[in-house]
Amino acid sequence: MVPTIIYSAILALSAFTPSVFAQTRSSGCGKQPSLANGVHNINGREYILKVPDNYDKNKAHHLVFGLHWRGGNMWNIVDGQSIQPWYGLETRAQGSAIFVAPNGKNAGWANYGGEDIAFIDAIIKQVESDLCVDQSSRFATGFSWGGGMSYSLACSRAKQFKAVSVLSGGVISGCDGGNDPIAYLGIHGINDGVLPFQGGVNLAQKFVRNNGCQQSNVGTPQPGSRGSVRTDFKGCSKPVSFIAYDGGHDAAPLGVGSSLAPDATWRFFMAA
């Protein structure tokens, strides 16, 4: 068992002071960066950083978190086996984003006492003090437990993140707060036997309410069609969409080569 590291409330609060969020450009803008691509460590926990090849220290970049599934690790986000690298988002970003893949504790995101939220807070603080980030353009996505952690971020960090994309998620990393609006995309297989489809719908419905959207039923594809149906909720203060696809509990909906989740996620992020 990996020893539990308790992050103090001071750490979490120091990462997000009101003065930080009054500005758009991070304090790392204009600096010669010291953080390089590869593995970095904060208080015994690791994350992988990917900075664009054409990184410009004076240009504010999107910041995108890719969160792994249960039994996985940060390397699964970048190795291109179960999913396209970085959930297919790096190629679509075309050098406009900095990517982070944190490593979950004990191969997951139990988020005991908010420790995983505090870890992500600390990563943001470290990255943004060294690199040029648009602080109004932070995003998170993940599959399964990584989706649950993305949902947890939507609950407790809606004012710090612009949007999340939750792939086959559930309420498995907690939902501290959970009353603020945030742009929310859910993607879920209708035959998911691990985290049921209706649970994914319920996650989205929370932000339908938070964002003041008009209530609407979620469309579903015909079983066996290998298709998908997207529902865009109307009247929202921040967008909420849900994609139901003909599949199960899949890290890459409709297959690793499918553009469904990568295209939908990146376009949703950029339109949020």
Swiss-Prot record:
Catalytic activities: feruloyl-polysaccharide + H2O = ferulate + polysaccharide
Organism superkingdom: Eukaryota
Protein EC: 3.1.1.73
Function: Involved in degradation of plant cell walls. Hydrolyzes the feruloyl-arabinose ester bond in arabinoxylans, and the feruloyl-galactose ester bond in pectin. Active against paranitrophenyl-acetate, methyl ferulate and wheat arabinoxylan.
Species the sequence originates in: Aspergillus fumigatus (strain ATCC MYA-4609 / CBS 101355 / FGSC A1100 / Af293)
Name of this chain's protein: Probable feruloyl esterase C
GO biological process: xylan catabolic process
Any one GO cellular component localisation term in the record: extracellular region
Signal peptide (UniProt feature, chain positions): 1-22
Localisation: Secreted
Record's keyword terms, sorted: Carbohydrate metabolism, Hydrolase, Polysaccharide degradation, Secreted, Serine esterase, Signal, Xylan degradation
Top-level EC class as recorded in UniProt: hydrolase
GO molecular function: feruloyl esterase activity
